[in-house]
Amino acid sequence: MNNNELVSVIIPVYNSEKYLEECLESIINQTYPNIEIIAVDDGSEDSSLDILEQYSNKIDVYSQQNQGLASSLNLGISNVKGNWLKWFSPDDVMFPNTIETLVTEAKKYDDNTIIYSNWNIINDSGESLREFQESNYNELSAFDFNIRLLDGQQINVNTTLIPINLLEKCKIRKLDDPVAIDYDLFLQCAIQHEAKFHLIMNPLIKYRIHTGQLSHKNITKTMEYVEKIRDEFILQLDDSLQKKYFNELQLYQKTKTTKRKTMELGMKLISSTPSYVSDRILTFYLNKLRQNR
């Protein structure tokens, strides 16, 4: 293997001591042999940096004063050597064959295609709650997929494998709401650089949801911010494309009344139930949203 088959995994770390070792071990023990792991500690106040340094013979460790997620990612990206990038959360866990499966699929497509997958949801203790199934848009045209993306279709960035050449064209931007950084990146790739997206139906990661992580207030705030980013992107297009996207988006959204009713119900359930059951309700709610797309 050569660097054309090297996968660069970037882990932005901030106060992640509780799950960090489990995350690192899941990456180090991948069946795919050609991986570089780059961890960037963003001024953690716990033992995260100490844990990273214990793995310094297996991973590249960088540290900086607290500057936020975008800065950590950009520092990591500036040091990658691989042909593909995998951005991964220090709370989450890969299956042993995650990267091998992603690379095998990526080789079937051009270097302008982002590969992503379904994922399993786990709780604080690592207990599996259920599989989260992404809507399968593999047969859609790039334009129709972009409409879904502009409508707020979320792709779990932790499942993705991104060609490095796309990240040479796009920017990880510092945003007021860091939760939207990945959505902003995907819009850049899709709308500005005509990237395509391909879904693997198998779950390839364990995505950890923390008790109290999401709330009605936070979900509403993020959704509003996502809509702001979307409108900014459309307004950057030439007049004919602006009109085409706005018209198609409005037409698509007219069919979404069922989805929006489900969303409102889901938010009420999350905000009105005790935190110890919210995770389970959330998984049901998330899948209901996807079923109504």
What are the language-model segments listed below?
Residues 18-21, 44-54, 93, 97:
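Acidic helix N-cap motif at the loop->helix transition within catalytic regions
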Residues 26, 41-50, 67, 89:
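A conserved acidic beta->alpha catalytic loop
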Residues 78, 137-221, 225-226:
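Conserved nucleotide-sugar donor-binding catalytic segment
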Residues 64-80, 101:
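Glycine-rich, basic loop-to-helix element that forms the pyrophosphate-binding segment
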Residues 177, 184, 191, 197, ...:
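C-terminal subregions of glycosyltransferases and related glycan-biosynthesis enzymes
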Residues 85:
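Short aromatic/hydrophobic "clamp" motif used to bind/position activated sugar donors
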Residues 1-28:
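N-proximal low-complexity "stem/linker" segments adjacent to membrane-targeting elements
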Residues 97-130:
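Conserved donor NDP-sugar-binding/catalytic core segment of glycosyltransferases
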